[in-house]
Amino acid sequence: MPPSISAFQAAYIGIEVLIALVSVPGNVLVIWAVKVNQALRDATFCFIVSLAVADVAVGALVIPLAILINIGPQTYFHTCLMVACPVLILTQSSILALLAIAVDRYLRVKIPLRYKMVVTPRRAAVAIAGCWILSFVVGLTPMFGWNNLSAVERAWAANGSMGEPVIKCEFEKVISMEYMVYFNFFVWVLPPLLLMVLIYLEVFYLIRKQLNKKVSASSGDPQKYYGKELKIAKSLALILFLFALSWLPLHILNCITLFCPSCHKPSILTYIAIFLTHGNSAMNPIVYAFRIQKFRVTFLKIWNDHFRCQPAPPIDEDLPEERPDD
């Protein structure tokens, strides 16, 4: 083991690799399932595919770059900054995709009769494009000047060096904590989290209200329709918990770094916080896809057709989304 890599770093790298090995195949399988099953082509699954694409990129690109940054190679300042920014872009896209799915589920409960007229594939595509554009804006903001270049240049000049600074590439050396806390956390992480709390509370309220009133829905069976939506809402509550569990620790540590520079942060806490954020990408296929029967049946067909060489029966596109025991 190279002397520059500590035991904590080695453990961190191993966990990151494990997360990537789970995240990439799991999310590729989600995308594959939508491709082969026509029943998974409505607007709802467009958002799930967008989330899966972001999560594949987290496992295939963000995690390798995070490992590179953790090792800390010697690079030019802007080279290191370019390595750090994709992490911000793709993790932000995951957050916005989660929010889009929450809003989509809210609309299914709020306007069940008009849902398909309001949430069309075209509008879903526009929403997805908007999420990605916002993610690039948020993630590339450090490239436009909100970074630590001035401080690094002062230290570089104080040593009598000329030209662009060469530094040990580490995330906190190039990315401003003011950006991470005031802009990234207080604007693009915390508000979506709070908004999702409100959305999920409203979803539960609407479902309970409709179940009590027994108002007819598009399915013609209010108990069945809203009972299914209640099960889905419980999944959303789990997603909310996992989102908070995955993202808040790292941002709390960033706040400590900014507001209490003298406070000691054990390295192991930083490593745990980082792989929790990446681990959220590995959780999503399990929480979203495996609770939907159409996905489960399609996964089984893919497995039998392509890995066991045993063709599965044709997919019944009229399968209900939820099993009775979910």
Curated annotation (Swiss-Prot):
Task: Provide the glycosylation site positions.
Answer: N159
The GO cellular component terms are: asymmetric synapse; axolemma; basolateral plasma membrane; calyx of Held; cilium; dendrite; dendritic spine; neuronal cell body
Is Iron-sulfur among this UniProt entry's keywords? Answer: no
Question: Tell me, what is one Gene Ontology molecular-function annotation carried by this entry?
Answer: G protein-coupled receptor binding
Q: Which residues lie toward the Cytoplasmic compartment?
A: 34-46, 103-123, 202-235, 293-326
State how changing E170K affects the protein, per the record.
In a colorectal cancer sample; somatic mutation
* Bilayer-crossing regions: 11-33, 47-69, 81-102, 124-146, 177-201, 236-259, 268-292
Give residue spans on the Extracellular membrane side.
1-10, 70-80, 147-176, 260-267
One protein family per Pfam: 7tm_1
InterPro entries hit by this protein: Adeno_A1_rcpt (IPR001068), Adenosn_rcpt (IPR001634), GPCR_Rhodpsn (IPR000276), GPCR_Rhodpsn_7TM (IPR017452)
Q: Which UniProt keywords apply?
A: Cell membrane, Disulfide bond, G-protein coupled receptor, Glycoprotein, Lipoprotein, Membrane, Palmitate, Receptor, Transducer, Transmembrane, Transmembrane helix
For membrane topology, the record states:
Multi-pass membrane protein
| SUPFAM superfamilies linked | Family A G protein-coupled receptor-like
Q: List, in alphabetical order, the GO biological process terms annotated in this UniProt record.
A: adenylate cyclase-inhibiting G protein-coupled receptor signaling pathway; apoptotic signaling pathway; cell-cell signaling; cognition; detection of temperature stimulus involved in sensory perception of pain; excitatory postsynaptic potential; fatty acid homeostasis; G protein-coupled purinergic nucleotide receptor signaling pathway
Q: Where is the lipid attached (S-palmitoyl cysteine)?
A: C309
Top-rank taxon: Eukaryota
Its function, per the record, reads:
Receptor for adenosine. The activity of this receptor is mediated by G proteins which inhibit adenylyl cyclase.
Write down what this protein is called.
Adenosine receptor A1
Annotated gene: ADORA1
